[in-house]
């Protein structure tokens, strides 16, 4: 993948995360605070815990830091997949957000 392709796909992912935060806030009482700064989105939960998602341009990866640990995702041509085989980005984000929020949350692309 070229740098331009990476940036296009990565920007779409970050936008989808922001839009999911808005949708979740509109349809639940989760009260997420999603803040975008450049190539990073920080999601802050009611309990003040956070999930941080950021671009790693030189590696063509998306990194996610959650209470459960750090995750690296690389686009496989179809989806952003964990580099250690732990699954797809939005499934991992939904799982970690659910754990940190204490209620079921669904992030989608």
From Swiss-Prot:
Listed InterPro entries: CyaY, Frataxin/CyaY, Frataxin/CyaY_sf, Frataxin_CS
GO cellular component: cytoplasm
UniProt keyword Metal-binding, yes or no: yes
Swiss-Prot/TrEMBL keywords: Iron, Metal-binding
Gene3D superfamilies, per database record: Frataxin/CyaY
Gene Ontology terms: biological process: iron-sulfur cluster assembly
Function: Involved in iron-sulfur (Fe-S) cluster assembly. May act as a regulator of Fe-S biogenesis.
Name listed for the protein in its UniProt record: Iron-sulfur cluster assembly protein CyaY
Taxonomic placement: Bacteria, Pseudomonadati, Pseudomonadota, Betaproteobacteria, Burkholderiales
């Amino acid at each position: 993948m070229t740098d331009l392709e990476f940036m296009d796909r990565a920007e779409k992912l970050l936008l989808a995360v922001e839009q999911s935060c808005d949708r979740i806030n509109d349809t639940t009482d989760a009260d997420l605070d999603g803040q975008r700064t450049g190539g990073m989105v920080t999601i802050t939960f009611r309990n003040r815990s956070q999930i941080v998602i950021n671009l790693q341009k030189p590696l063509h990866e998306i990194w996610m830091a959650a209470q459960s640990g750090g995750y690296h995702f690389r686009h496989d041509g179809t989806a952003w997949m964990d580099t250690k085989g732990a699954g797809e980005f939005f499934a991992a984000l939904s799982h970690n957000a659910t754990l940190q929020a204490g209620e079921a949350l669904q992030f989608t692309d």
